[in-house]
Amino acid sequence: MEAGEGKERVPKQRQVLIFFVLLGIAQASCQPRHYSVAEETESGSFVANLLKDLGLEIGELAVRGARVVSKGKKMHLQFDRQTGDLLLNEKLDREELCGPTEPCVLPFQVLLENPLQFFQAELRIRDVNDHSPVFLDKEILLKIPESITPGTTFLIERAQDLDVGTNSLQNYTISPNFHFHLNLQDSLDGIILPQLVLNRALDREEQPEIRLTLTALDGGSPPRSGTALVRIEVVDINDNVPEFAKLLYEVQIPEDSPVGSQVAIVSARDLDIGTNGEISYAFSQASEDIRKTFRLSAKSGELLLRQKLDFESIQTYTVNIQATDGGGLSGTCVVFVQVMDLNDNPPELTMSTLINQIPENLQDTLIAVFSVSDPDSGDNGRMVCSIQDDLPFFLKPSVENFYTLVISTALDRETRSEYNITITVTDFGTPRLKTEHNITVLVSDVNDNAPAFTQTSYTLFVRENNSPALHIGSVSATDRDSGTNAQVTYSLLPPQDPHLPLASLVSINADNGHLFALQSLDYEALQAFEFRVGAADRGSPALSSEALVRVLVLDANDNSPFVLYPLQNGSAPCTELVPRAAEPGYLVTKVVAVDGDSGQNAWLSYQLLKATEPGLFGVWAHNGEVRTARLLRERDAAKQRLVVLVKDNGEPPRSATATLHVLLVDGFSQPYLLLPEAAPAQAQADLLTVYLVVALASVSSLFLFSVLLFVAVRLCRRSRAASVGRCSVPEGPFPGQMVDVSGTGTLSQSYQYEVCLTGGSGTNEFKFLKPIIPNFVAQGAERVSEANPSFRKSFEFT
């Protein structure tokens, strides 16, 4: 148990030891450091080295922003931060600075700003013997009755010496004579008062006047001296000395009393009569300050104010007044004047450190260091400091009337960029006086705001076939910061789609956000694309944001209709067969066309442009179906050529033509063959034979037709494609998107016709297929062909 307690005592003892060490350090920093210098020392003279006294390293004073702060507006000292030397800024006159006060001490502070630390110091000004004793009156007149008995003392005017200490007035001597010797007496104030002592009786008839030289000596090395003539007039006997009613008068007078105010009235009486009883009043042992401040009436003894009083300069006056009768006898009294302090001085504020510009987002940062003072006393000299309540700053009291102005909360330049702070110092006097000091603190910008786009996304419309470098739109971002922190630079961000060639499509002006199309856009190749743009400021570090830009390409009518069927590529044309017995409205074929554009630019209309037999055929305007318009006649030519115009609804409209060949046949017994010109006669002769063969073939083929129909349906369902024989079919490539046509007349599914003609010796074969509809899936399909996709007929002729 004891061992454990011993172990616990050791940390406690250490804690107590550390506490006392820290307490000693704190007291050491508060105790002033003392320095001294002789008065009248030349400016720039060395006083002390603060670097050594404060225990700091070389260069630390400059880094910590050391400075010397003293009361008042006059700087008596200069300080070298680099060397730490404290030098005199000017010659110092101790008498001017301190007057009779001894010791003469000038307090000052050594202020270290970073971190904040104060050191108290005092500069004592040592007196030098630079003033000689001076008598205010070069001639001192004494009227002494001849009846005065030996041993009587006479107080004479003392000399003034502005020096203090050993350099002040120390001794008086009188010239050798038979009647008087000199006696020195110390007053309560420590002043040496010279007195003449009568050695033997005077005889006016023997010597009516005595002249003596009074010499005042100071204690300097070498000593200085001053002389005055003491002239003694021996008068007739006057055996009564004037007596004052009181030996001590105590009065109080406010410091704001006007000039001419009555301070006091002294009164003395003399029992003698005649001239020996006539009393006159005069100052005795009065200093120059008393003579300047007060005026004494020689007849009435009224003490009046000659000039304004100032409590802050002198608080009390001791006035010696002498009453002298006509016979030369005199008595003295003392008037003790106490100046009453009034609150006539407003507080004073001295700014030591001020930082006018501070970055935002800082907290607990020092803005200013200042001191306050009030020359008044008591409550008149007590002060309180304050600033406005609605500011993010607070005042922190320091040592000996020093205050620091500190940031309480982080500043935001975007909310407020400038603060006008009024520091108010008020005393507790009546009435209360105050001093206001205004400072302006500018908040410098920190890059704490990223650029913000005016929109999170932008939609731009560009018509296709635009010219390269076309301005297609703009993006805009703003930054709440200022200066370079608010300068925004725009850029294109890498696209999310790796296959999008963004760098070749658009560019952006880095300064103003203008977007340009780098190439001519094609709606049919690219209808829309999107990308991201970034906006970055030029702060450090730079902040950025991004926005989405969507570009929609508007279609232009730059594609003509494309005819899918019948194919117009120069190959052998397909020939449509129409029986002569066809009724009006018989579907001959259908012109199928598409348009690569969109919208109304892809709305197609059809019209019959040319025909071998006008009025025989008609074309439906919206779906391109070619139908018979009337019954066929015998005189109608067997070969019909139709030109169908396909036109879109664009502005201006574009068009294409399709050429159809129609063969009019009497039933399907004999196809029309391109034979030599000599064949028509023979064909007419064999017309009956053809009809018979057709009838026989029809009957014979009924069975085969059923079988073929079943097989065709099976094959179509499996392969989803039409069986193609030796015939003229649409050839050549066409884009898949051309099949995708809305309900504007262009089919959503393809028609395919087969016409096969085979010529040979004695055998002719004709095959007619109804439209075969492949399994194409297209957008916007309007309808499906009315014909059965699996329907097939086959006719054979021999």
UniProtKB/Swiss-Prot annotation:
Cadherin domain: residues covered: 37-135, 136-244, 249-349, 354-453, 458-563, 570-673
Gene, per the UniProt record: PCDHB2
Main localization category: membrane
UniProt-recorded Gene Ontology molecular function terms: calcium ion binding
Keywords for the protein's UniProt record, in alphabetical order: Acetylation, Calcium, Cell adhesion, Cell membrane, Glycoprotein, Membrane, Repeat, Signal, Transmembrane, Transmembrane helix
Subcellular location: Cell membrane
Residue intervals annotated with topology Extracellular: 31-692
Native organism: Homo sapiens (Human)
N6-acetyllysine modifications at: 299
Protein name: Protocadherin beta-2
InterPro entries linked to this entry: Cadherin-like_dom (IPR002126), Cadherin-like_sf (IPR015919), Cadherin_C (IPR032455), Cadherin_CS (IPR020894), Cadherin_N (IPR013164), Protocadherin/Cadherin-CA (IPR050174)
Function description: Potential calcium-dependent cell-adhesion protein. May be involved in the establishment and maintenance of specific neuronal connections in the brain.
